[in-house]
Amino acid sequence: QRSFRDRIIVVKFSAEWCGPCKKIKPLWNEWISIVSSNIVIVDIDIDESIDLYVQLKAKKMVKGVPTILAFYGDIMRDQWYIPDDSVSGGNEGDVKNFMNRCLIKAKTLIQ
């Protein structure tokens, strides 16, 4: 059983009605089909988890939707809820760059 230390947790906040979410959905679906086994994907529809979304937005962790957060298991911190990387909005270039950073980091964790 692997520990969290060699994993990345990626959490995406989106909504069915969100235009930018729809724009990046094909890119997201393609990416999650090729991610390494040490990347754990959590996909949250804010309409189904509004309390969590409101709480994270109040902490300025989520600016809006879509927002994707990455938590690296090899970084020790007191405030575990602060992401190590993130991207917000529907800019496909920004989302691709975020995804590439996650893939690169994931490879370093299993070497």
Model region roles, listed by residue range:
Residues 4-16:
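Short active-site neighborhood of thiol/selenol oxidoreductases, capturing the structured segment around
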Residues 4, 42, 49-52, 58, ...:
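Compositionally biased low-complexity segments enriched in polar/charged residues
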Residues 23-26, 55-57, 70, 81-83:
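Short coil/turn segments at secondary-structure boundaries
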Residues 63-111:
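Non-catalytic, surface beta->alpha helical segment in thiol-disulfide oxidoreductase systems
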